[in-house]
Design a protein with these regions (language model features):
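Conserved ABC ATPase "signature" region
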Residues: 117-135
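Helix-to-loop junction immediately C-terminal to a conserved catalytic motif
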Residues: 54
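Conserved catalytic motifs of ABC-family nucleotide-binding domains
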Residues: 161
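Conserved ABC ATPase signature
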Residues: 140-144, 148
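Hydrophobic anchor residue at the start of the ABC signature
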Residues: 154
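The feature captures the beta-strand-to-loop junction immediately N-terminal to the Walker
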Residues: 39-41
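Conserved ABC transporter NBD signature motif
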Residues: 62-73, 81
């Protein structure tokens, strides 16, 4: 399993008067078992870059490959890629939307085709892994503290058992 970017550039508002270049000819390869940190100043393109890893953003030019396959090719399974490349956003609490913690964390596994029972089991394992107490499972995530919300959001991605986990300053 590998993730590879070749000469990836990205422009916000391409072709408009507000065109802003965010990435310029980025080359990067991440292989199984590697830990990679991307550092830079605010506004340097870190979040934009990682959104290319699972196809949330499409390169203006260049190519992104997952396991040797170009993710921009017709017929490439982007939905499957998003299950394999889990992304926890910079403000993970903005990822929460369900009426209870357990339902929120079950969302990903259910969308991967798990039964309700399987999804609940995966959700409980992920919540325990990040230290969310069982008495919070039926609470609305919006009543939790900021730190608890972040843990729940991270659990939601971990419950999908991604091959690659991307953390954008969670």
């Amino acid at each position: 399993m590998s993730l590879k970017l070749e000469d990836v550039s990205f422009v916000y508002g391409a072709g408009t008067s507000s065109e802003t270049k965010a990435l310029n000819n980025v080359n990067l390869e991440i292989n199984k078992g590697e830990f990679v940190a991307i550092i830079g100043h605010t506004g340097s393109g870190k979040s934009t870059l990682i959104q290319h890893f699972n196809g949330l953003e499409k390169a203006t030019s260049g190519n992104v490959y997952y396991d040797g396959k170009n993710i921009a090719d017709k017929g490439f399974d982007i939905r499957g890629l998003r299950c394999k490349v889990g992304l926890v956003f910079q403000y993970p609490e903005h990822q929460l939307f369900e009426e209870s913690v357990i339902k929120d964390v079950c969302f990903g596994p259910l969308n991967q085709g798990c039964t309700k029972e399987q999804a609940i089991e995966k959700a409980k394992e992920a919540l325990q892994l990040v230290g969310v107490r069982e008495e919070l499972y039926e609470k609305t995530p919006f009543e939790l503290s900021g730190g608890q919300k972040r843990r729940v959001a991270i659990a939601g991605v971990l419950a999908m058992n991604p091959e690659i986990l991307i953390l954008d300053e969670p």
